[in-house]
Amino acid sequence: MSEAPIPSHWAAQRERGSFALMRLTAWAVRVLGRRTMAPLLYLIVLYFYLFGRSARDSARQYQGNLARWSGRVELQPSTRSVYRQFMSFAEALLDKLDVWSGRVGRERLVIHDQANLHASLAGPRGQLLVGSHLGNLDICRALAEMGGEVRMNVLVHTRHAEQFNRLLDQSGADNLRLIQVSELDPATMLQLSQRLERGEWLAIAGDRVPLHGGRTAMADFLGQPAAFPQGPWLLAGLLECPVNLLFCLKQDERFHVHLEPFAERIRWRRADRDAVIAQAVQRYADRLAARCLEAPLQWFNFYPFWNTQDPRRD
């Protein structure tokens, strides 16, 4: 386990102008439409592809690890495949704005839910969804719409949560809220517990460590050690709520939403808490790796994801 901050942190990169850019882009899409905005957004992403060496190297590292871990030679990275991953990200940004604007109808959703979890959306007590930055986590909004009046609370690390909520209000996203959770202090835990008791659901990404460090657990991911946040699993244990996994992958212009039950409860004793959390993190990493094979170019963590300093690599 570790509490050390991660160099070249993803959040430090995203915070720079992220809200202003999202506000401008959301306005432009509303006024000009997706068809007009798409070429501009692709040009912006192309710029970051050409001049963002760290992001290119990170995408190449991911593709190389995926190819070696899976044994699938066709997934080996190339200049073309790395470029296509960036273009997939541009497409996902446009899809994100469509979701926020309510333009993703049920006819574009394909729900894979063998346990019939989405029927629980209207239950008396909420549950926790753990997603990732593979595919489009913002489909939570469309999922909330399926539950009628169910409110979905997306837990984020950005300092601009309230500003984003104003954008959501302007787009008519009444059932979706962003909540900043920099740390799990008593006030935050009380608020989240109350939301669950009101039947609201929580969603959080399980693949990114908060900006100011935070407790992490190492897991084998695509054949290499990587640091994952303990936060989602600590949250689930403290709130004593069911935990489910959520993946949303785009295939043939439709969004395939995969809902998987993960644990009825995350329980630990003081002596074995770290071991229980580490086991949950590894299970999550295994499921995430399997989903990467279904949409290999929809991995949108463009920063050094693998911790090369982990002693297990020596």
Question: Model-predicted segments: where are they?
Answer:
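Catalytic core of membrane glycerolipid acyltransferases/transacylases, capturing the structured
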Residues: 81-84, 91-92, 123-183, 198, ...
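General small-molecule cofactor/ligand-binding pocket signal
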Residues: 110, 179, 260
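Non-catalytic C-terminal accessory region of glycerolipid acyltransferases
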Residues: 32, 51, 146-147, 170, ...
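Membrane-anchoring hydrophobic helices of lipid-metabolizing enzymes
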Residues: 2-131, 167-169, 176, 251
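Short Gly/charged-rich anion-binding patches and loops
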Residues: 24, 58, 115, 139, ...
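Short hydrophobic/aromatic residue motifs in ordered secondary structure
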Residues: 36, 136, 299-300
